[in-house]
From Swiss-Prot:
Substrate binds at residue 59. Optimum pH is 7.0. NADP(+) binds at residues 59, 174-175, 197-200, 216, 254, 265-267, 312-313. Keywords: NAD, NADP, Oxidoreductase. It catalyses: 4-hydroxy-2,5-dimethyl-furan-3(2H)-one + NADP(+) = 4-hydroxy-5-methyl-2-methylenefuran-3(2H)-one + NADPH + H(+). It is an enzyme of class 1 (oxidoreductase). This is 2-methylene-furan-3-one reductase.
Length: 323
């Protein structure tokens, strides 16, 4: 098992932890001396540089899926970007010193790790990680994995292909901004439409991939005469989404419950998807989208969650630097 010099990897580290379910503002506490996780043969230990927050983090803290959650206490954080400091004996893709990023949890809602990314060190399975694109900062890289992989998997499930049209519900969110970009630049959609609130329409336009920006505060997308081959619902409105799809088209959603024939799915995290998207990220065709308030310092994680929970975020909320 290769490692950095043992004296450089401490036995304890700083982390944010909750030991009971509830609102992050009530239950999330800073702990200066949490045990650094031991790695398995197919894992690496990462010195965390940046982490991003996702709605699944605060929903998990609230106990939304406690029946399938790992036992408390929990260090939250799915998305990580950092440097490999130790590798398990079966790891072949990464070595000590590699800059990596990924979504730590292969199955988001079933036994997610208790050692998330809001800590100085975290353990990750080799299969969920990828090498960080050289042109991206750690902040940018940390913003990507869960959101861009979710966008990609949904478009694959919807069978979006070149020449088809797509409508994105919630185009300015962490996932929505990537659905728009991937639909246009990776899947070759002929037309990309997206909904957002009035103040977030400019963001859709700056992405340069949305052909039609719909202000949902002023018009109902389901009443438009134009229908779409694919509707990707990132907000939880499948009852309306199914009215906007062409006959024989596909509706996918990441927010249940799903009105048939919409397909509800939960992401399976794969480093191979990040590797596949690497050329698009390195060329600048697909760009990370950070909320203007990002990054939040490690001391302000509770405030970062409060902002994310307010639904005001446009793009991703990132925590950096992590000591």
């Amino acid at each position: 098992m290769a490692a950095a010099p043992s004296e450089s990897i401490p036995s304890v580290n700083k982390a944010w932890v909750y030991s009971e379910y509830g609102k992050t503002s009530d239950v999330l506490k800073f702990d200066p001396s949490v045990a650094v996780p031991e790695i398995k043969e197919d894992q690496v230990l990462i010195k965390v540089v940046a982490a991003s927050l996702n709605p699944v983090d605060f929903k998990r803290a609230l106990g939304y899926f406690k029946d399938t959650d790992s036992p408390l206490p929990t260090i939250p954080g799915y998305d990580v970007a950092g440097v490999v400091v130790k590798v398990g004996s079966q790891v072949t893709k990464f070595k000590v010193g590699d800059e990596v990023y990924g979504d730590l949890n292969e199955t988001a809602l079933v036994n997610p790790t208790r050692f998330g990314s809001l800590a100085e060190y975290t353990a990750a399975y080799e299969r969920v990680l990828a090498h960080k694109p050289k042109n991206l900062s750690f902040i940018e890289a940390a913003s990507l994995p869960l959101a861009i992989e979710t966008a990609h998997e949904g478009l694959e499930r919807a069978e979006l292909s070149a020449g088809k049209s797509v409508l994105v519900l919630g185009g300015a969110g962490g996932v929505g901004t990537h659905i728009i970009q991937l639909a246009k630049h990776v899947f070759g959609a002929s037309k990309v439409a997206a909904t957002a609130s009035t103040k977030k329409l400019d963001l859709l336009r700056t992405l340069g991939a949305a052909d039609l920006a719909i202000d949902y505060t002023k018009e109902n997308f389901e009443d438009l005469p134009e229908k779409f081959d694919v509707v990707y619902d990132a907000v939880g409105e499948t009852d309306k989404a199914v009215k906007a799809v062409k006959e024989g088209g596909k509706v996918v959603t990441i927010v249940g419950p799903a009105t048939p024939p919409a397909i509800l799915f939960v992401l399976t995290s794969k480093g191979s998807v990040l590797e596949k998207l690497k050329p698009y990220l390195e060329s600048g065709k697909v760009k990370p989208v950070l909320d203007p308030t990002s990054p939040y310092p490690f001391t302000k994680v509770v405030e970062a969650f409060g902002y994310l929970e307010s639904s005001r975020a446009t793009g991703k909320v990132v925590v950096y630097p992590i000591p």
